[in-house]
Amino acid sequence: MKIGIPRGLYYYHYKDLWLSFFKRLGIDVVISEKTTKDTIKKGMQYSNDEMCISLKAYLGHVVSLQGKCDYVLLPRIENYGLNTQTCNNYISTYHKITNLLEIQAIQYNISLTKNKTEEKEFLKWSSILKKSKKEIKEAYHLACLDAMKIRKALEE
């Protein structure tokens, strides 16, 4: 199995967690190329006028992963608690992508106001990834530790 990760939006914040998580489960990862004019042009073919350039680039990254992986990771962060809602265009991106493109997506939604934590959302992937919930939970916790170590090292 191969998971595609678009190199956009929250990628640079979460990449260490995601890469460690999938590596610990023995799952191959393919990351889209760095953003170029072509990436944005590809994304513009599937976007509307109200979408910001970041979302257009993100769509381009997803398009570039078509045919290179079994599933594309499409995170959705609705909020981190009260008064922290993200952009409505961003929140709807998962649905736009899955309706416009022929891809299989792995999605998770963080919404602390709805008690949807990252860990709970990762556990939902067990059937897709063909791993037990115990394996998912262990890989998630170890990946969180890995990501924290990397962030600490970068801060020093």
Task: Enumerate the language-model features and the residues they cover.
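An N-terminal assembly and electron-transfer interface module characteristic of large anaerobic redox
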Residues: 1-156
